[in-house]
Curated annotation (Swiss-Prot):
Gene3D superfamilies: Knottin, scorpion toxin-like (3.30.30.10). One of its GO terms (cellular component) is extracellular region. The keyword Disulfide bond applies. Blocks voltage-gated potassium channels Kv1.1/KCNA1 (IC(50)=0.6 nM), Kv1.2/KCNA2 (IC(50)=5.4 nM), Kv1.3/KCNA3 (IC(50)=0.014 nM) potently, and moderately block intermediate conductance calcium-activated potassium channels KCa3.1/KCNN4 (IC(50)=225 nM). Also shows activity on muscle-type nicotinic acetylcholine receptor (nAChR), since it reversibly and dose-dependently inhibits acetylcholine-induced current through mouse muscle-type nAChR heterologously expressed in Xenopus oocytes (IC(50)=1.6 uM). This is Potassium channel toxin alpha-KTx 3.7. It comes from Orthochirus scrobiculosus. Disulfide bonds join 8-28, 14-33, 18-35. It is found in: Secreted. Transmembrane segments: none annotated. Expressed by the venom gland. The keyword Iron does not apply.
């Protein structure tokens, strides 16, 4: 995945930031969002 500079606690918090970054969805790992490219 692609790490974006968005802090998170749960994976659901990464959904919008990843969409805004032009990617599909993301999960929270080590306090940062990891997005899945389209």
């Amino acid at each position: 995945g692609v790490i974006i500079n968005v802090k998170c606690k749960i994976s659901r918090q990464c959904l919008e930031p990843c969409k805004k970054a032009g990617m599909r969805f993301g999960k929270c790992m080590n306090g940062k969002c990891h997005c899945t490219p389209k």
